Amino acid sequence: MNRGYALQYDEQIISYGIKYVLQVIKTLVIAIAIGSVTQKIMNTGIYVYFFIKLRKKCGGYHAPTQEICCTLFGIFLFITILGDGIFLDVHKIIIIVSAFVVYLKLSYEVPCGTIQNPIPNGVKVIMAKELKHYCQIGIFLLGGVSILNIDMGYFAACGVIVCGVLFG
């Protein structure tokens, strides 16, 4: 009897793993598609790099559904890659306002674990400090490169802020 339960539990774990891998592939396909359509593959690579590195190190915000998560990823990727010289003044305002509003909101919610992978309280404190550190660096970089009007530096700062603040 226990053996049947163990097999069913293993099937659930395998099913969850397959769904997770498919979600990651879907997210990467969206990133590649947006990068291809906008002809900003390098910018997309920088964004995805920041996203993965910061998400792994700082935890993150989890949207209520996978569709919302994927949509948010795509929207903020699109906003971020537009920071490389296109609509720069409007983009600066969008990023600065978004960064501060979302940073304030998520300061109380990030990092959060999942049912499958809860984060112990001691680790949450460390991850929250890491997130704040990345956000402070991003905001400092954004301010500096905005004043100096450095497009690629501005884009990198946007990547740090958008990934660090929105996805922790």
Where would I find each of the regions flagged by the language model?
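Hydrophobic transmembrane alpha-helices
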Residues: 1-43
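Membrane-helix boundary/juxtamembrane motif in polytopic membrane proteins
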Residues: 112-138
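C-terminal ends of transmembrane helices
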Residues: 51-62, 109-114
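Interfacial aromatic-anchored transmembrane helix boundaries in multi-pass membrane proteins
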Residues: 56-72, 78-83
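Cytoplasmic-side transmembrane-helix entry/capping segments in multi-pass membrane proteins
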Residues: 64-75, 92-98, 123-125
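Hydrophobic alpha-helical transmembrane segments in multi-pass integral membrane proteins
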Residues: 80-92, 133-152
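Alpha-helical transmembrane segments
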Residues: 89-104, 158-159
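Alpha-helical transmembrane segments and their cytosolic interface
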Residues: 143-168
